[in-house]
């Protein structure tokens, strides 16, 4: 969602911006350390940058973009809520090797433990709704 909100040529830019505009200081869009790092990694990946017509961006540019998001009054950051680690282990446990589950399960556990709604473009987060995830699936908007 964060990357789509920043790159105007992202196919879901409009949806992501609308989601961000719905956030308020009382009910903010929340960054955690994992989403900070993921945003910075993706915002400085040459293949993605090329896809969005943003070649030549540096790590410093990605940090500036993150800073601009963090400066918005409706955006905040949060430390890991109590119980996140145990819940993450529980909902990530699979009887198969599923490397893509780790981050999704962590973000879901963070949102559940923190009592915040998770906005995403990724349908895979539906798997965590039975565990208590309050999901705003932007593609269904």
Language-model segments: which ranges?
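Active-site neighborhoods of divalent-metal-dependent phosphate/nucleic-acid chemistry enzymes
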Residues: 71-119
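Histidine- and aromatic-rich ligand-binding microenvironments
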Residues: 100-101, 122, 136-141
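Short, hydrophobic secondary-structure boundary micro-motifs
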Residues: 32, 51-52, 77-80, 137
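Alpha-helix capping/helix-boundary segments
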Residues: 35, 83, 124-125
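Short loop/helix-cap segments at secondary-structure boundaries that form the rim of catalytic
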Residues: 125-132
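Amphipathic alpha-helical repeat scaffolds of TPR domains
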Residues: 37-40
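Short, well-structured N-terminal submotif of metal-dependent ribonuclease cores
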Residues: 1-31, 43-61
